[in-house]
Each structure stands twice: as C-alpha cells, then as structure tokens.
Amino acid sequence: MPVPRILDSIVVGGQTFTLMTRISGELLIDKFDALSDAQLDTIIQDVFAVLRSLWTLRQSTQDSGKVMLSASGHGLPSPAQMFEELEGPYDSILECYFHMACHLVDSEAELRQLYPAASEALLTDAIVYVHADLRSHNILVKDGRLSGIIDWENSGWLPRHWQLHVMRRSCSSTR
C-alpha cells in the first residue's frame, strides 16, 4: 500500500511526534490541472484500489462493531465538534449517530422510531478502516499515477459510507 512506514514515535517537550518514511510525489491538488483526463481516471482507480484494500482489514475480536475508533484504541475527531474534540469509540454505528444528533433525539430508540429506513441503512453498513481526510491535498502523484496517501492521523474504524463524507472535491479547477 502506498503509505508512509512508521519508523519511530518520540516525545519532545511534552508533544508526541511520529517519524515516518518519505513518499515521493507531488500533491494532487497542485498537479490537478496538469494531468490529462486519462491520468486522472488512472489515479482515481489507484485510490479506489487502496480503499478496497483497506476495506479488507478486519477489526480485532474485542473491538468488533465499534466505530469512531482509532488504530490506537482511542476516539476520533468528531465532525459534530468541528473536528476539535475526540469522541468515541462507540459500540455501534447507531450509538455514534445518536451522540452526533443528541440535540435532535433523546435516545437511540427514538432515533430508530423517527428514522427507521436511515437507521436500518446505518445498521447494515460495514465497519471498515477509513482515511478520514482523503482529499486531493493528501494524495501524492508521480508520473500520472498514485504514489502515496498521507495524513493518516485521524483514520480509524468507521462506517464505510463515512469515506464518502470525506472525499469531497477540494480542487479549485473547473474540471
């Protein structure tokens, strides 16, 4: 997989830093207009292949079914808190959504009652490993191909549809 390899984790002045390998390439956001449609199609297919590979990873038995769960077992930055605070992990997808919508409903049961179709769709979605900031400023390209994906700090176990939320187009191009 085209991701940096972790070399070490160190604490300096009370802050933790992760040292990792460098991946060659340029940010997709900076090369977007210079790439042909065929090259962009290839890069999209390359990224999708990485996603499919991530989706084959399985949670550990003790964490099975949990969401908003980082690789280290902690919560993840919450979109309900403008990504400023960690939330989770939650024991289920529905519990996660209840906490994000707690100002709208009083319980998970009420959430299910008010939105049965949405609740069913949420409950049947797969829990997969998601890159929580997979946009063009974190995709590296070289010679018209994907060369790497960076900024994995907020990735973790989330519903598969979550990946759609984070893959918004952030290019300024007219293409």
Where on the chain are the PLM-derived regions?
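Weak global preference for isoleucine
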Residues: 6, 10, 21-23, 29, ...
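Short secondary-structure boundary/capping segments
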Residues: 9, 119-121
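Active-site catalytic-loop/activation-segment of kinase and kinase-like phosphoryl-transfer enzymes
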Residues: 50, 55-60, 64-119, 128, ...
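Active-site Asp-x-Gly
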Residues: 124, 128-129, 135, 140-175
